[in-house]
Amino acid sequence: MKKSLLSALTLLAVGSGVSSCSKGAQDAPRTGDLSAETELTAPLSGSLQTDSLALVDLFNSLGGMNWSNSNYWASEQPLSKWYGVQVTKVAGEPRVTALYLGANNLKGSIPASIGQLTALRTLQLQYNHEISGSIPEELFQLTRLNSLRLRFTNLTGELPAAIGQLKEIDTLDLSNSRYDLSQWWNGDPKTAREHRDNLYTLSGKLPREIGQLTKARYIDLSFQSFTGDLPAELGNLSALRYLSIYGCQFTGGLPAELGKLQRLEYLSAGLNELSKPLPAELGNLSNLRELLVSYNKIEGQIPASLGRLKKLKNLNLEHNQLSGSIPAELASLEGLYQIYLNDNQLSGQIPADFGGAQQNNLLWVDLRNNQLTGSIPARIKRTLPEAEKYAAIQGIPSYGYTIFVLSGNKLTGSIPAEYLAYPKTLKHLVPQQEGYGFTNGPK
């Protein structure tokens, strides 16, 4: 079979055809597609014939005869008709510029010959959970790659320093999360870590050369076995908007250099082994919408600088070892929809303005299982329609008014009348710690 393929493919450099590929509906948007004609300032090695040979090797190495869709592979049809293959003119010559083979039952190891696809801009092999072995070093020689998606494969080994060669990368998805977390999540950190540990494939330290991916806007490394400190060079990713390292084993703390990422909108670092205090520089992330650092071992106080994150919608710091008082500055976050500070060691009183008139979008405030003292602020109010839309999209419980979850603290005094008018809220106020409680309402 391989010999006949090679014979057929020698004709394809002449009769290639240039068109968009046939791709499955499961593939992600083509963020890295090239236009029909792209002029390059640097010389480009290879040809359509070398691309053809590389595709043959890919087909054989990844069990092509058993793919879910292998239309026109192993045929004399132009490469542009092969399922998932996109051929585009590059500097006037037809070349393979994209492979869309996600969720296609690929099995085996990625061959080193993939490095011969020197014009490749998009490589999507995600959701092929029987792709195994390490990521070949040659893949990182594809310096024109714009989109690399290897999500939920069974790749192993460490990321090499050569990852820094992908200087054109916009989307890097190496995550290993195919599961609906709600199926096994019960709020217990031990259970969460046990399930996390069963998902690991990639390992080792994150190379500091990742900081050379200065055009990257989306990086997802979640649920991999990465360890050690996060490299300070992450602060060089000036175009980054989305960063997830959720469910890894990183230690140390979030680098202060992350505060330089002015375009960052989403930062997820939950379920790691982070312990150092949160850096005040996080308050410089002026476009941040979600800050998720739950289920770590972070000590120290919540930085007051987080009150400068005016676009923040979701703040989740639950299940850490945070201490000190809740910064009053958090009451100035007018766009906040939900905040989770539960299961820490926070003390002092709930800030008087927390959940006040400025925070009309606030749906959910979880402060349970801390060491908070004093009385409950009278802050029950109707939420705005925009908040209800957000709740529906995010799957957040919504009652049409702000919910405070305050059980497991040291609160005293009387329950404000505003709470008594909304009986559904009362179950979230009790019980308090032994020896504490309220003079009215449920016990």
Language-model features, listed with the residues they occupy:
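Leucine-rich solenoid repeat scaffolds
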Residues: 361-365, 373-443
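Conserved hydrophobic beta-strand positions in leucine-rich repeat
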Residues: 99-101, 123-125, 145-150, 169-174, ...
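The feature encodes a structural signal of leucine-rich repeats
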Residues: 110-112, 132-137, 156-161, 183-185, ...
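Bacterial Sec-dependent N-terminal signal peptides
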Residues: 15-50
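Leucine-rich repeat
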Residues: 93, 116-119, 128, 140-145, ...
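LRR flanking "cap" motifs
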Residues: 60-109, 178-205, 440
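Intrinsically disordered, low-complexity Ser/Thr- and acidic-rich flexible linkers and loops
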Residues: 176-203, 356-361, 382-401
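Consensus "Asn ladder" position of solenoid repeat domains
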Residues: 104, 128-129, 153, 177, ...
